[in-house]
Amino acid sequence: MWLLSMSDFLRLDHMPSHEELHRKGLLVPRSRTHFCIFISHQWLGPNHPDPKLQQLPVLQNAFRKLISGEIKAMSDLSSQFVGDSCRLSQKECMNLKSGYIWLDWFCIPQKTFELPFEFDGSSDEDMAYMVKVVSLRSPRSRGSPSNQDLFISSIPFFVEVSDMFVALVPRLCHSSTSLQCNFKTYLTRGWCRLEMWCNMLAASSAPFLVVKGNDQVELANLTFLADHPPHEGEFTVESDRRVVYYVMQRALKASLRTLEKQQRWDLFRFTVARYETLLGLPPPKRDFKLFLRDFRFTSLESAKKIPGIGPLECAMLSGQVDMIPFLAGSGFEMSRVIHAKLNMKMMQGKRSPLDLALQLVWRNPDVALELLKFRADANRPNGFGIAPLGYCRTPGAVEMLVQHRADVNKRSGPLFMPPLSICCSSCAPSGVISKLLEHQAQVEFQSKGVGGSQPLACLAVFASSNPHCLDSAKLLLDARSQIDSHYPATGFFKAMEMVARARVLGGSSSSLLKYITEWSTAPLGVACFFGDDEYVDFLLSAGADPDIPNARGHTPFQLANGENVLRVIEEFQEFSI
């Protein structure tokens, strides 16, 4: 595993290839003492990752600012709101300064050649894995791997031993297609998804940073990344889809071995149940005995006491529809509250099997239908007050729940947010938004709790990673959503806003507290605060008023974050003169 020191990386004024860096003696082999930073990025050219030298300075500037303390990397606000409040520690920022970079263009040979040995047909698992990768990447090969094959097949290992994972996703244009590349498009790329999943499956708890600009760095929200299997991504070379399958399979098996050894049973069972979905395989057919063995249950009776991922969740997540009636007849509650210990806090507690089925098993709608047949409650809110409709990922799921008397406008405490707002904030496809509107979901309502809960405002929260954002916004505006509507927080959340104001005035730098003080702003203000320039531009073009103040007297433009948003605002103001 070749690495480039951070000091040498920060001095680069171009993107040298692996061969050039090697020739200059700048690459060093990894040692256990190195603080290794794995860089994942979308290439901006067909034969070169950064032909116009646009990505490189963004990453250099972001690292400089993290090292100096000028910017802080924290969890996104949605994660912070439910208690998943993490930040890059001072020690980790200092480790960056003496760290070492792994980036494909730097550390994988770009000039390929066959290595002087052949596979001997050994049954060894590692050798069999390499044979598969080589045969798919080099179909004309007679069994001799190339130098590049070895490096690509080792990506899970490279991620596993890294101390930090960085997704480099600034908004830039592809040099040959002129199409925009950003976090949304990064999430569609098969190889990027693979690297991302290798990080999530790794035994280490390496921080996952998302770099969107020189001053926009945050810790990734793993909840929304959990439903992006690599094989469903886009590939420039179609045969790479099968290569990724084998690499992902290897990473999954390694993760399961580690989880079983550590006896992290919730995450182990969750991963076993998702195994086929993550690889694009059909649902497994397990008899009762095999079901208990695969999920490591000693008996069905003892499994009833498991508060986390139990038999019902395993059957549901793995798509074993035929097991659900049996479990229902054995006394398992279809609407029970799950308290699981996973590595995604937003998915851990206060959830029901139906919630998870709608969010993660939407590829097999029969699972949710079977839960409903056995009296899963289509209206029962979870601990956050979110009704099952808020987790729908397909129009068919919305229709199914409505047929089971789900209320499309149901709001429950503590959040008091209707399904339409939840779907907008969780990046649901625009078809889901359309179906909710078809069933008379309200686009305007008086807030009962949290500020900024209007659907148009909710779209802004994850606009930078939501490929459906603008299409959904158009649907809402066509349904007569008021582009400048804004309502103050009420009750407990009004008190929370007052406390947040006091904390910010007292010197707190918490981005969550800053948002809470400003959440009475209009959708444009929310978009400016969360820093998505595309959505800001869309709202301005649709006639949003940039001068409407919130409860603190601040206008949307005064809440702007990120250089790209500031650029959009500057262009708008110049055009308006």
Predicted regions, residues:
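Ankyrin-repeat boundary/linker signal
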Residues: K304, V337-H339, M346, P381, ...
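Ankyrin repeat A-helix N-terminal signature
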Residues: C314-Q320, K345-G349, L356-N364, G390-G396, ...
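Start-of-repeat signature of ankyrin repeats
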Residues: G308, K341, G349-K350, G385, ...
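Ankyrin-repeat-protein effector appendages
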Residues: V272, H439, P467-A479, D484, ...
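Ankyrin repeat domain, specifically the short helix-to-loop turn at the C-terminus of the second helix
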Residues: D294-S299, P325-M334, I338-A340, L369-D377, ...
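The feature represents the membrane-entry module of six-transmembrane cation channels
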Residues: M1-K345, G349, S485
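Eukaryote-biased feature marking scaffold/signaling PDZ-domain proteins and nuclear chromatin regulators
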Residues: S31-H34, Q54, L96-S98, L194, ...
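Solenoidal tandem-repeat scaffolds enriched in leucines and small polar residues
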Residues: A406-N409, G413-M417, S421-I433, H439-Q442, ...
